[in-house]
């Protein structure tokens, strides 16, 4: 076969297989048998192997899985992947409707309701119609690059029907039938099964070997358009229609509703229909449909004001409590946990449930051997609601909390105004281990590859006892641990080294100072700028900071008034751990008189000197708001190269337009 004929046949096969994929995985209407599909795929794979110069990144053959990865790279989202506020009953939905109408002066509101798929949120980036990158949601700001695994999902188009640059967001999931089949295979192989389809989807997508993901038969529904160049779409429902036209799989069960009564009826309808779907849903997402109204309502730090997620009611089941286990947290709190006969609840096999504290056990008269009601909703930890007293036989055992710590044998105490028993031994191994797990966690030092399992191994091997010990770990030590090879050990040492460059707020949160959460840690870091300045702060100086109360101030002062802590900080310095704040000082910028304060700005086209993401951050730091489309409420359009249709929209609405040079002049004043 000549090169010219081979190239033509390769292109024919790609078009044919892309059509077959779309019909089967998006339209759910296959036109050929599996055998015919496989025959065409094998022919394509063979021709591409014989003619590697014709290989393409968007070939359907890529979906069988590519090269094994060493690590998932971090990806910063162009715009945050915000979580949604929750509604749990009809009253919550009506409150949401009232807030929306108040926020837009009772303008006519149309809602769009969609099924809330219980999977893994991901973003998909396309340039000129080609899929170039996919990422997990992560913490909403930073996710992980899972491009190669997403390419194995046949519901995700590798090439769109238009040469458009955009970001789509959606939910990757595992169909129920695929989940059942996968667990059957795992059981036959003597492997641990997945608890639910969501965990199976997440575990499959985060495999370093894309071939594993390719075998798992994952799918995806796209639910939103986050960034699209040169196109203004006035409503969310129209954006979903547009995504469908481009070749994405969108959920067909969405509905627009003119009133909150229609929304409630939709929720009730799908609560009944839910079991008949071949994928898990855990609620309904309700959004204001009009994009201009969405922009008018805006967002809070965590979630948009124009959307809410209705969560289906918690599921309750009865099972037998077979024992009570104690755990010691990083602050010394001793928590009892019920051990249960395994039972399926809310799509998950549950073997343990929270008992909270000793008072709850006494109040509910919970005994070992009791039949109890267990409740679970979504990701919430299962809890024991009450005892079925009618099922008691007289053989049940009363439970009494111990007087000494199960980890270190120190006497337990109950501090004033607390219900929990607490171990106050600073050398308690359980507290130290839990503290280390917290220190490396995502919102703290965020050390990739250092999870609970590895921390436990390092702790048991006596390689680490303090936070600073992490920075003395060597590759040779890691190679002594189970499941560590040359690459994984090298990657972890590098990840630990990279964490030295974190901004101060991450280190502060990681230290686990009592009462200091992630938000307070950022407040302290921004206010004092250096660890040394914070260490010297008095209780009065701390309380003078907005939102810092007496308990937190006292806790911070007490923490740093400790020789062991000061020694730890000195060790951090010696290892080169950054202890200064690297973020934007929003408080300072808000005091600067700025043109952007209170203004609504649209960025369009390519900015040469700084990216649009950086420009957005600077405008927001100076009190402005950046939106994605031009409307009559827009104050300014900043137009870079190839600005396109937004210039026409600016002219239509009589909005001022700046080029990049003028924009930079204003920023640098």
Curated annotation (Swiss-Prot):
Keywords: DNA damage, DNA repair, DNA replication, Ligase, Magnesium, Manganese, Metal-binding, NAD, Zinc
EC top class named in words: ligase
Source taxon at top rank: Bacteria
Active site (record annotation): 116
Occurrences of domain BRCT (ranges): 591-669
Record: residues binding NAD(+): 34-38, 83-84, 114, 137, 171, 287, 311
GO BP terms, alphabetized: DNA repair; DNA replication
GO molecular function ontology, one term from the record: DNA ligase (NAD+) activity
Named cofactor requirement(s): Mg(2+); Mn(2+)
Disulfide cysteine pairs (residue numbers): none
Protein's UniProt keywords contain NAD: yes
Pfam families the UniProt entry points to: BRCT, DNA_ligase_aden, DNA_ligase_OB, DNA_ligase_ZBD, HHH_2, HHH_5, Nlig-Ia
EC number of the protein: 6.5.1.2
GO cellular component annotations of the record: cytosol
Reactions catalysed: NAD(+) + (deoxyribonucleotide)n-3'-hydroxyl + 5'-phospho-(deoxyribonucleotide)m = (deoxyribonucleotide)n+m + AMP + beta-nicotinamide D-nucleotide
Residues that bind Zn(2+): 405, 408, 423, 428
SMART domains the record matches: BRCT (SM00292), HhH1 (SM00278), LIGANc (SM00532)
Function: DNA ligase that catalyzes the formation of phosphodiester linkages between 5'-phosphoryl and 3'-hydroxyl groups in double-stranded DNA using NAD as a coenzyme and as the energy source for the reaction. It is essential for DNA replication and repair of damaged DNA.
PANTHER family the record matches: CHROMOSOME TRANSMISSION FIDELITY FACTOR 18 (PTHR23389), DNA LIGASE (PTHR23389:SF9)
Family from the record: Belongs to the NAD-dependent DNA ligase family. LigA subfamily.
NCBIfam families: dnlj (TIGR00575), PRK07956.1 (NF005932)
Name by which UniProt lists this protein: DNA ligase
Organism: Bacillus cereus (strain AH820)
């Amino acid at each position: 076969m000549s090169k010219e004929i081979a190239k033509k046949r390769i292109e024919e096969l790609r078009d044919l297989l892309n059509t077959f994929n779309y019909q089967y995985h998006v339209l759910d209407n296959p036109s050929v048998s599996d055998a015919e599909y496989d025959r065409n795929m094998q022919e394509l794979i063979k021709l591409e192997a014989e003619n590697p110069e014709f290989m393409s990144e968007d070939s359907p053959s890529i979906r069988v899985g590519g090269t094994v990865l060493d690590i998932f790279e971090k990806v910063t989202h162009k715009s945050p992947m915000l979580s949604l506020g929750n509604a749990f009953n009809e009253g919550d939905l009506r409150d949401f409707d009232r807030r929306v109408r108040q926020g837009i002066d009772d303008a006519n509101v149309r809602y769009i309701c969609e099924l809330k798929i219980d999977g893994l949120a991901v973003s998909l980036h396309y340039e000129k119609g080609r899929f170039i990158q996919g990422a997990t949601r992560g913490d909403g700001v930073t996710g992980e690059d899972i491009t190669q695994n997403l390419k194995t999902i046949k519901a995700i188009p590798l090439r769109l029907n238009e040469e458009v640059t955009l970001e789509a967001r959606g939910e990757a999931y595992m169909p129920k039938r695929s989940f059942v089949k996968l667990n059957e295979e795992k059981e036959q192989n003597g492997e641990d099964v997945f608890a639910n389809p969501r965990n199976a989807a997440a575990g499959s997508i985060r495999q370093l070997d894309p071939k594993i993901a390719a075998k798992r038969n994952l799918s995806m529904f796209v639910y939103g358009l986050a960034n699209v160049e040169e196109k203004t779409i006035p409503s969310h429902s129209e954006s979903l229609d547009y995504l469908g036209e481009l070749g994405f799989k969108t959920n067909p069960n969405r509905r627009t509703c003119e009133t909150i009564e229609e929304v409630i009826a939709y929720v009730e309808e799908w609560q009944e229909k839910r079991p008949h779907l071949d994928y898990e849903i855990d609620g309904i997402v309700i959004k204001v449909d009009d994009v201009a109204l969405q922009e008018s309502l805006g967002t809070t730090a965590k979630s948009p004001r124009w959307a809410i997620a209705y969560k289906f009611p918690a599921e309750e089941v009865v099972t037998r409590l077979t024992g009570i286990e104690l755990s010691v947290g990083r602050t010394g709190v001793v928590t009892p946990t019920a051990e249960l006969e395994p039972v399926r609840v809310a799509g998950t096999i549950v073997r343990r449930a929270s008992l909270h504290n000793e008072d709850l056990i006494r109040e509910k008269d919970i005994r070992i051997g009791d039949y109890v009601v267990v409740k679970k909703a979504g990701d919430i930890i299962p809890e024991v609601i009450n005892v079925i007293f009618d099922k008691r036989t007289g053989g049940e055992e009363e439970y009494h909390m111990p007087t000494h710590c199960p980890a270190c044998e120190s006497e337990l105490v109950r501090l004033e105004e607390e219900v929990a028993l607490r171990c106050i031994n600073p050398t308690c191994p359980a507290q130290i281990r839990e503290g280390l797990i917290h220190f490396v966690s995502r919102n703290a030092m965020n050390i990739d590859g250092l999870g609970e399992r590895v921390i436990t191994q390092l702790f048991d091997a006596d390689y680490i006892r303090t936070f600073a010990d992490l920075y003395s770990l060597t590759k040779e030590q890691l190679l002594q641990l189970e499941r560590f090879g040359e690459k994984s050990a090298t990657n972890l040492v590098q990840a630990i080294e990279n964490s030295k460059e974190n901004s101060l707020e991450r280190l502060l949160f990681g230290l686990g100072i009592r009462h200091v959460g992630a938000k307070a840690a950022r407040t302290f870091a921004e206010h004092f700028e250096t660890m040394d300045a914070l260490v010297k702060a008095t209780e009065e100086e701390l309380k003078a900071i907005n939102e810092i109360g007496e308990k937190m101030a006292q806790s911070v002062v007490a923490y740093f008034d400790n020789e062991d802590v000061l020694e730890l900080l000195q060790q951090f310095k010696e290892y080169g751990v950054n202890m200064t704040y690297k973020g934007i000082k929003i408080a300072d910028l808000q005091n600067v008189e700025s043109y952007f304060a209170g203004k609504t700005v649209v960025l369009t086209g390519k900015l040469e000197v700084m990216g649009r993401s950086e420009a957005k951050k600077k405008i927001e730091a100076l009190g402005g708001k950046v939106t994605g489309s031009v409307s009559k409420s827009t104050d300014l359009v900043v137009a870079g190269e190839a600005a396109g249709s937004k210039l026409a929209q600016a002219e239509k609405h009589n909005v001022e337009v700046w080029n990049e040079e003028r924009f930079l002049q204003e920023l640098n004043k």
